[in-house]
Amino acid sequence: MSSLAGFRNLATKIVCVGRNYKDHALELGNAIPKKPMLFVKTVNSFIVEGEPIVAPPGCQNLHQEVELGVVISKKASRISKSDAMDYIGGYTVALDMTARDFQDEAKKAGAPWFLAKSFDGSCPIGGFLPVSDIPNPHDVELFCKINGKDQQRCRTDVMIFDIPTLLEYTTQFFTLEVGDVVLTGTPAGVTKINSGDVIEFGLTDKLNSKFNVQ
């Protein structure tokens, strides 16, 4: 499992789950989903501490979304909920950076969200925590601070779809490879970020990352 500390170099994709916290869905005026909503970021989305967050060209409304990430430890295809936790090697925390103006335009046109979600650098990501450090991923606290002030803070027990459900559903449609990351959704509190902002995020008492916005 220790080899998964370098999961960013192993990953083939980042699977993201939309609207998995009721309060976030409602703050954007969206319906509560009846099944998981999935989209994918490319691995070029990853950036690490020391690299700046940069809005894509033309974006005027860039939002942050803090999310618990699940790191896959072995190839997973059409797995069951009862076995799903056996495919997890550890956890991380990331920001799903979203060009909200791009996304709003795509929604109106009935088009995919790809440009809004998967631009280069759209996934600032923290370090790796082995499963032994998080015995219950549904009982940790996500946080995100902007310029030192709380912007998002929520426990993971209020997810609409829990992690086994997400992994079972995802792997019915496509295979998860070793090192792939599944981002499990964001709570309420997303907001526009600006050049010069400092974003700090992580899991309370477990993991902390800090990024500057260019």
UniProtKB/Swiss-Prot annotation:
Main location, first listed in the record: mitochondrion
Location(s), subcellular: Mitochondrion
Enzyme Commission number, as recorded: 5.3.2.2
Domain of life: Eukaryota
Gene inactivation effect: Reduced brood size, impaired egg-laying behavior and a severe locomotion deficit, characterized by a reduced frequency of body bends, reduced exploratory movements and reduced performance in an endurance exercise test. Cells show increased expression of enzymes involved in serotonin biosynthesis.
UniProt keywords, alphabetically: Isomerase, Magnesium, Metal-binding, Mitochondrion
Cofactor section: Mg(2+); Mn(2+)
Positions bound to Mg(2+): 65, 67, 96
Gene3D superfamilies assigned to the protein according to its UniProt record, in alphabetical order: Fumarylacetoacetase-like, C-terminal domain
GO molecular function, one term: acetylpyruvate hydrolase activity
SUPFAM superfamilies to which the protein is assigned, alphabetical: FAH
A single GO BP: oxaloacetate metabolic process
Expression sites (tissue/organ): Widely expressed.
Any single Gene Ontology cellular-component annotation: mitochondrion
Catalysis: reaction(s): oxaloacetate = enol-oxaloacetate
TM region(s), chain numbering: none
Cofactor binding comment, as recorded: Requires a divalent metal cation for activity.
Record family assignment: Belongs to the FAH family.
Protein purpose: Tautomerase that converts enol-oxaloacetate, a strong inhibitor of succinate dehydrogenase, to the physiological keto form of oxaloacetate.
Protein name: Oxaloacetate tautomerase fahd-1, mitochondrial
